[in-house]
Amino acid sequence: MALPDFSMRQLLEAGVHFGHQTHRWNPKMTPYIFGERNNIHIIDLSQTVPLLHQALKVVSDTVGRGGRLLFVGTKRQASDIVADAARRSAQYYVNSRWLGGMLTNWKTISNSIQRLRRLDEMLSSENLGLTKKERLNLERERDKLERALGGIRDMGSTPDMMFVIDTNKEAIAVQEARRLGIPVIAVIDSNCDPDVVDYPIPGNDDAARAIALYCDLIAKAAIDGIERQQGSLGVDIGESAAAPSEPALETASAEATAEGEQPGSQA
């Protein structure tokens, strides 16, 4: 496949152009603002289009080199969408609470992931002789760790790139990535600082339809990267008898080649 296509019409229908109330703006967003309507800033989609296309190319190239992409979106309307996009594209995600040190203190996070795996093994065993209370306590611990770390349990190390919905809410995640030199792609609304990310995408970061569109495009770009990587290794995805090395690739490829879905309804 190739990089995913999108149109100005899709962006408009998803409400990508709607910013926040004018009094909430960040002056650094001035170059990306078209104007205002009813005290709401209107984002200049003529700038969003090339910047979004650039972000898709960077994602495809990074994943095509074997890089790992981390989706980050913990706000209510982004949580499920982010997780689904990451799973479809065989990538990784944080969609609950960002734990301080998730990137900068990876050793501690790795220990927690190992604990999560041990709990899974313990709870799947019938021979531990646990009481109901002991099992319940272990299940609660496992569920808590799964919510926080389930999306990165197989990542192996820090990611090679991060895609963020709402840089204000995910400020700690962005700071940690910058400290480690991890490139950040992010949707920047009219109240955000575009200078804190490497690849800004001016747009609405609150509407579920807009979030669904961004995540779908980023996921498809990652799938394109995986397929190009396998192609460069001489793997014929269409005729290979062996299963793809990425566990989610089969589902991802099928969905990516289907006709584009309409983004979800706005929150």
Swiss-Prot record:
The keyword Ribonucleoprotein applies. One of its GO terms (molecular function) is structural constituent of ribosome. Residues 237-267 are annotated as: Disordered. Signal peptide: none annotated. One of its GO terms (cellular component) is cytosolic small ribosomal subunit. PROSITE patterns: RIBOSOMAL_S2_1 (PS00962), RIBOSOMAL_S2_2 (PS00963). GO terms for biological process: translation. Residues 238-261 have a biased composition (Low complexity). The keyword Repeat does not apply. InterPro entries: Ribosomal_uS2, Ribosomal_uS2_bac/mit/plastid, Ribosomal_uS2_CS, Ribosomal_uS2_flav_dom_sf. Keywords: Ribonucleoprotein, Ribosomal protein. Gene3D superfamilies: Glucose-6-phosphate isomerase like protein, domain 1, Helix hairpin bin. It holds the Pfam family Ribosomal_S2. HAMAP family: Ribosomal_uS2_B. Belongs to the universal ribosomal protein uS2 family. This is Small ribosomal subunit protein uS2. It comes from Chelativorans sp. (strain BNC1).
